Design a protein with these regions (language model features):
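C-terminal "capping" alpha-helix adjacent to the active site of nucleotide-linked donor transferases
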Residues: 294-296, 304-321
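C-terminal alpha-helical cap of glycosyltransferases
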Residues: 335-353
Length: 353
């Protein structure tokens, strides 16, 4: 069986989920290819598109949120003959039995292609945040793999039958799902995703580092400026650049301070590491943060004026509270359906036969 996973590098979350999904499917002896969809449909302006995105989320989040909400209510995708031919060439060369989308733009374009050119194409989509807006939805999708029951309800409210929705969480590397090592007392991981972006953290870290019994591992991602800023600055801090071994640091930590990204959320859940969320400012992050609060698996700072450092220190001194958060994470894990696209595809083939 051949599987083609289409994604995009808006941040690193969607791409990371795709690589994790590839790892999972290859364990089922499936041939899997992960493709940045923007390499295919917009090869000449891809770099510009990503540069604008990175600028907006770091400097102009209000403008980003405006465009996010606009696209959330639209299934429009500019589709012309050139784009159709590029998609057709990709699908033909991949010889894929299944196409999986982990990014809504991919979902829009492949749904349009399927509707107009190839009704038999199997199209599955993995939604990589708790909130599922309309840009993820299409009648051409054969199966939705979603993060939570909350996501499932949102999909059903858009007219999708529950039989086409599987609650499996968001894909993470298998290492996050393996047995958890003993947590290190007062170990904190600070990370802002692959781009290493957490605004206004300097003051908080400065106060935390005054406590010699606290150790912080700062995962700077691809943010070289952040890496250089904190390298060798504090004796009780370890700074790590971009790494594929986030699980090593997260699984031994008592707490992770981070943004409310969907991938990081489920990495923390599988690691049973309580989450401390700095003020969420992107629309999809707000939905993830509300999920964290509702399920009591972490703390969300909504107001920038809050005394974050003192709050973190008090949380580390509250083992019962941290243990309760870990128990809630385990309950969320237990609710996830144990299935994947290979099993679903096999069931559909049997049904057709």
């Amino acid at each position: 069986m051949n599987v083609l996973i289409l994604t995009a590098k808006y941040g690193m979350g969607h791409y990371t989920a795709s690589i994790s999904l590839k790892q999972e499917l290859e364990n089922e002896n499936v041939q899997v290819e992960v493709v940045d969809f923007f390499d295919i449909i917009f090869p000449k302006i891809k770099t510009l598109i990503y540069s604008v995105f990175n600028f907006l989320i770091s400097k102009c989040s209000n403008i980003y949120n405006f465009f996010y909400k606009f696209s959330a209510n639209s299934n429009f995708a500019p589709f012309n003959k050139i784009i159709r031919k590029r998609i057709e060439k990709l699908i033909t060369e991949s010889n894929a039995n299944i196409i999986i989308s982990t990014f809504p733009v991919c979902t829009k374009y492949i749904s349009t292609y399927k509707k107009n050119n190839n009704k038999k194409l199997k199209l599955y989509t993995y939604i990589t945040d708790i909130e599922a807006n309309k840009e993820w939805i299409s009648e051409e999708i054969d199966m939705y793999f979603v993060a939570s029951n909350e996501t499932k309800i949102q999909i059903m409210e858009n007219g999708i039958p529950k039989e086409k929705i599987k609650v499996v969480g968001i894909p993470v590397r298998k290492e996050f799902k393996e047995e958890i090592c003993i947590k290190d007392k007062n170990e904190i991981v600070v990370m802002g995703g692959g781009l290493g972006l957490i605004p206004d953290m300097d003051k908080t870290l400065k106060i935390l580092m005054r406590n010699e019994d606290i150790h912080v591992t700062l995962l700077a991602g691809k943010n070289q400026k952040l890496f250089n800023q904190y390298s060798n600055k504090y004796d009780n801090m370890t700074v790590v650049g971009y790494t594929d071994e986030v699980y090593k640091y997260m699984k031994k930590a008592q707490l992770i301070i981070t943004k409310a990204g969907g991938i990081t959320l489920f990495e923390a859940i599988h690691s049973k590491t309580p989450i401390y969320i700095m003020p969420p400012f992107l629309s999809q992050e707000i939905g993830n943060a509300k999920f964290i609060e509702k399920n009591e698996i972490g703390v969300v700072v909504w107001n920038k004026s809050e005394n974050v450092s003192d709050d973190i220190i008090q949380l580390l001194k509250s083992p019962d509270k941290l243990e309760k958060m870990r128990e809630n994470m385990q309950m969320l894990k237990d609710r996830l359906e144990k299935t994947n696209v290979v099993e679903i595809y096999g069931e559909e083939i049997i049904t057709v036969c």
